[in-house]
């Protein structure tokens, strides 16, 4: 029997073809269009579209709340640039989680780096996300049926941010909101939150950090160790050219040595995988 190896990219294209559609829906808002970096979920309809406009944009990197009339969150990314957004109403056969996951995976396949990821009540109040952050009342729904993700695209588009927000409303209608922000000036170094690293690790089984190709960087060691110590039950394999040095650095920050094994000493950057 002849076995043919299918390239990963081709295999993913086959998988996603059942989820995504490039065909515009007749019910789409007039003048709207898809964003080139996030394919449309099959049978989804565009119900809100805002063409590129230059503005100052603030993206939360923490649970949001309102105190004395002011929106509060632990961290943020703020910059001036061009913002384009599209909101999809999803077909009944797909949940908001389906759309969110498919969009996230499509962006990660393009090398996008996750900066902040929250789900359900960890995000704060849906009404604040809908009205204060995105200015779109269609996105107001149940606090426990929401998800938000902020990503940074890979080179050569590293000054592009993408925000995803999914929600299921009380009437069970599900929506996915996507924003593409092109910064007018270089964004510089942006670090993810420790909780986001842990969520990514537990959701996908791995962390791939190609930019961390050299010796351990103090800021990253601190972030990763804090994330790993949020769930001490995980056992992990650390791989990469400097895997041994990273393992030692993480142990030095309080991660138990028994939890960490050293994997292959090659590859691009740093890779951490969950031992199943």
Regions found by a protein language model. Give the residues of each.
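Generic structural signal for beta-strand residues in well-ordered domains
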Residues: 17-19, 229
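An acidic-aromatic pocket/loop used at catalytic or ligand-binding sites
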Residues: 25-230, 244-255, 261-276
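Bacterial N-terminal signal peptides that target proteins for export
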Residues: 1-12, 19-22
């Amino acid at each position: 029997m002849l076995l043919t190896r299918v390239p990963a990219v081709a295999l993913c294209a086959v998988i996603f073809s059942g989820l995504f559609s490039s065909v515009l829906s007749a019910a789409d808002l007039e003048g709207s269009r898809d964003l080139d970096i996030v394919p449309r979920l099959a049978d989804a309809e565009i119900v809100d579209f805002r063409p590129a406009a230059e503005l100052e944009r603030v993206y939360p990197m923490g649970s949001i709340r309102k105190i004395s009339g002011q929106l509060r969150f632990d961290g943020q990314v703020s910059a001036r640039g061009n913002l384009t957004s599209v909101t999809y109403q999803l077909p009944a056969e797909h949940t908001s989680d389906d759309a969110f996951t498919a969009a996230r995976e499509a962006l990660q396949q393009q090398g996008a780096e996750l900066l902040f990821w929250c789900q359900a009540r960890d995000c704060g109040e849906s009404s604040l996300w809908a009205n204060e952050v995105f200015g779109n009342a269609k996105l107001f729904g149940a606090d426990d049926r929401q998800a938000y993700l902020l990503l940074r695209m890979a080179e050569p588009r590293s000054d592009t941010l993408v925000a995803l927000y999914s929600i299921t409303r009380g009437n069970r209608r599900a929506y996915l909101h996507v924003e593409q922000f092109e910064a007018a000036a270089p964004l510089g170094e942006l670090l993810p939150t420790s909780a986001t690293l842990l969520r990514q690790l537990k959701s996908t089984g791995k962390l791939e950090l190609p930019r961390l190709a050299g010796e351990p960087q103090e800021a990253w060691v601190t972030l990763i160790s804090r994330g790993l110590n949020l769930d001490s039950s995980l056992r992990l394999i650390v791989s990469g050219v400097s895997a041994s040095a990273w393992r030692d650095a993480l142990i030095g920050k309080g991660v138990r040595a028994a939890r960490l094994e050293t994997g292959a000493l090659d590859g691009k950057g740093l890779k951490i995988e969950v031992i199943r």
